[in-house]
């Protein structure tokens, strides 16, 4: 069995550990470390400030693994773009020093910016947000690393326990009601990471997004009704099409992955 380190034992990391992998993980606080250990996960305190802050013995235990999974998102607020980029580079450099042969990094489809139509992995990346630009730069850096094999997963909007999409636009006025949604369930992200951990080699770049893309003006009102919340109102420009549609089929075609929840309208949210 492979031993895997997960940096970012949050709502993505904890379910991955529950899949039965031999896992070490990190949390930023001692309380978080204790909670993870109570759940049966070997966990150690680690902070990125952006330099890596971790006791030497803890770092030895954390990174004595066959693969590293990084699920720390680039924040839209808080410390700037350079902070996140430097922190991730510090972390990966440490992994390389420990000769970890496989790295999986969860990026975001925000790297595509305002692209229209069907978006595949080879679609030019033109991010329009600070976090998207940071992720693009980090992707390029990871892709060119020598001596290791990096998989990059570009995740669509994440939904699942604790992230009910009915709360995203409840009671708000929003544009582009005819545009399709680009969402993926937590369990499918965990499934994709698990599949990559089992693959004989890395170096992949995949979009992870449910195959169905119901219109925003259909999907979000239905989700708010499930929560008993006020539905959103959408402003529609004439003939503005379906917007950006993320194609997440490449991992299916190449590795035989199957989305457990292909349709956002019937995804379990709690």
Enumerate the predicted regions with their spans.
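Conserved Rossmann-fold cofactor-binding substructure of NAD(P)-dependent oxidoreductases
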Residues: 39, 44-65
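C-terminal amphipathic/interface module of NAD(P)-dependent oxidoreductases
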Residues: 42, 46-50, 239-270
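NAD(P)-cofactor binding segment of oxidoreductase domains
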Residues: 63-104
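Conserved Rossmann-fold NAD(P)-dependent oxidoreductase catalytic core, especially the SDR/UDP-sugar
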Residues: 90-128
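Conserved beta-loop-beta element that borders a ligand/cofactor-binding pocket
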Residues: 108, 137-161
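Glycine/proline-rich active-site loop of Rossmann-fold NAD(P)-dependent oxidoreductases
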Residues: 136, 148, 160-171, 187, ...
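Substrate-positioning beta->alpha
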Residues: 152-155, 164, 174-197
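Mid/C-terminal beta-alpha module of Rossmann-like enzyme folds, strongest
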Residues: 190-195, 199-248
């Amino acid at each position: 069995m492979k031993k895997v380190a997960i940096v970012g034992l949050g709502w993505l990391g904890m379910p991955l550990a529950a899949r039965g992998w031999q896992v070490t993980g990190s949390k930023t606080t001692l309380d978080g470390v204790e909670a993870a250990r109570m759940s049966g996960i070997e966990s150690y305190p680690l902070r990125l400030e952006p330099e890596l802050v971790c006791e030497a013995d803890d770092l030895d235990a954390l990174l004595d693994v066959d693969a590293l999974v990084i699920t720390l998102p680039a924040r839209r607020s808080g410390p700037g773009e350079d902070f996140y980029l430097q922190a991730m580079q510090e972390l990966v450099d440490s992994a390389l020093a420990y000769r970890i042969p496989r790295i999986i990094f969860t990026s975001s489809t925000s790297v595509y910016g305002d692209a229209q139509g069907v978006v595949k992995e080879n679609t030019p990346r033109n991010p329009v947000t600070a976090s998207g630009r940071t992720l693009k730069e980090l992707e390029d850096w990871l892709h060119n690393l020598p001596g290791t094999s990096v998989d990059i997963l570009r995740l669509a909007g994440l939904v699942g326990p604790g992230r009910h999409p009915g709360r995203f636009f409840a009671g708000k006025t929003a544009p582009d009601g005819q545009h399709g949604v680009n969402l993926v369930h937590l369990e499918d992200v965990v499934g994709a990471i698990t599949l990559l951990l089992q693959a004989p080699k890395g170096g992949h770049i995949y979009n992870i997004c449910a195959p169905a893309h119901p219109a925003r003006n259909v999907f979000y009102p239905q989700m708010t009704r499930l929560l008993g919340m006020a539905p959103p109102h959408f402003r529609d420009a004439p003939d503005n099409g379906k917007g950006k549609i993320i194609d997440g089929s490449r991992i299916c075609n190449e590795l035989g992955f199957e989305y457990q929840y292909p349709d956002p309208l019937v995804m379990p949210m709690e």
